[in-house]
Regions:
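Ubiquitin-like/PB1-type beta-grasp interaction modules and other compact soluble beta-rich domains
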Residues: 1-79
Length: 81
């Protein structure tokens, strides 16, 4: 699956996107754990639940199952004005 990082999140990860195998994360909760382990500086943001996740361009909830073909976008809250 492909993970895409946006805004200041990609500054923390130092990459815009990466590919991971499904065996690292079968659902969104497992993916969050994987990301925290790989990028510890994101932990405080994950714990506050301020990051937003979209799977194949649809907002996702924690227990959403993942597939190898999925594209996951991770981004901060968006505000307008």
């Amino acid at each position: 699956m492909k993970i895409k990082y946006f805004a200041w999140i990609k500054d923390i990860t130092n990459i815009e996107e990466e590919e991971i195998n499904l065996n690292k994360a079968k659902n969104l909760d497992e993916l969050k754990t994987y990301i925290i382990e790989k990028y510890p500086d994101l932990k405080k943001h994950m714990m506050k639940e301020i990051l937003r996740f979209a799977i194949n361009q649809e907002y996702a909830v924690n227990n959403t199952n993942l597939n190898d073909e999925d594209e996951i976008a991770i981004f901060p809250p968006v505000s307008g004005g």
